[in-house]
Amino acid sequence: MPFTPSDNTDQQFSPDGKGVVHSLIIPVYRNEENVPDLLQALEELGRNIPAFEVVFVVDGSPDRSAEALAEGLARATYAWQLIELSRNFGSFAAIRQGLALASGRQFAVIAADLQEPPHLVEEFFYRLDKGDVDLVVGVRASRNDPPVTKFLSRLYWRMYRTLIMREIPPGGVDVFGCNWAFREALMSLEERDSFLIGQLFWLGFRRGEVTYERRARTVGKSAWKLRRRWRHMLDSVFAFSDLPISVLLWLGALGTLVAVTATFILMAAWLSGLIQVRGYVPIMLAVMFFGSMLVFGQGIIGCYVWRVAENTKKRPLSVILSHRHGPALMLRSESPPPTSELP
């Protein structure tokens, strides 16, 4: 759907961000090969979206993503910011940093790999400009990923929706758009090792959805390796649920019941003379079972305690290494509603 602004007055962009209304945040990590196609797609968006800026956040990428962006942005016709973080803090921290520094009044977030079609950004701003929603999320109708990846993703999100947060769409969420009010509420949640998608739905507000088909990756390789996926899964669970501790509690209660029952049975057997020699194997099995359960339980509790400790340190969620701005550019004549009409 083509984007249509709600007002028509001349607007000038200045380096301090005055005049920017629509900000697109793009986290960048190992996307050097995607940069040419990405910049070309953004040029097309810039022609369709008024008062538009793009905020690139290079999340400690080990390749030449930052250099490639700097070279390409020298010829960009839209307003832009290029932020480099001092190391890899994770995509969620990069997105937050981009939201914090964006100059607009409405915001959208997409990935740099172009697996989400860029026209989603126009859809997000169209819905936000209507004023009936505060948050718009992209919902995958289908995804062109390897079968194993699709199966594991479907299984994970189904379990997450069933056990932890039912509001999240069945296929999960990777991209979203929001207005100023929602952005301010989101930025107030200064939690380390949290789950950004969970925060979006935990906050509430008026939500809308835009359905799309996730495209196959044609350039480069995904940086979401097994270790990152595992950490992402742990953060998504421990940040929004006490389910692991509840399961541990029920396992402990069940183990206690079994132990008490076994005690009465063994005492009755011993008094009746059925047990002549104490068995080595049952004792060892019991010790190993309950010992491993104890260690497992301590690990679960430790995950929660560690997250509490991390949040008490008050360290910044990310550190900026460099921050560059695009030149002052004349944007399209269309303008958003006056500031007084925005949240």
PLM regions with names:
Residues 47, 74, 100, 126, ...:
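Solvent-exposed polar/charged
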Residues 29-33, 115, 119, 187, ...:
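Residues in soluble alpha-helical coiled-coils and helical-bundle/repeat scaffolds
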Residues 2-21, 195-343:
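Hydrophobic helical membrane-anchoring modules
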Residues 42, 98, 113, 136, ...:
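Residue-level signature of catalytic and energy-coupling elements of molecular machines
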Residues 2-145:
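Structured catalytic core of nucleotide-sugar glycosyltransferases
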Residues 83-87, 91-101, 118-194, 215-234:
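Acceptor/aglycone-binding surface of glycosyltransferases and processive sugar-polymer synthases
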Residues 41, 54, 88-91, 106, ...:
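Residue-level recognition of specific faces of alpha-helices
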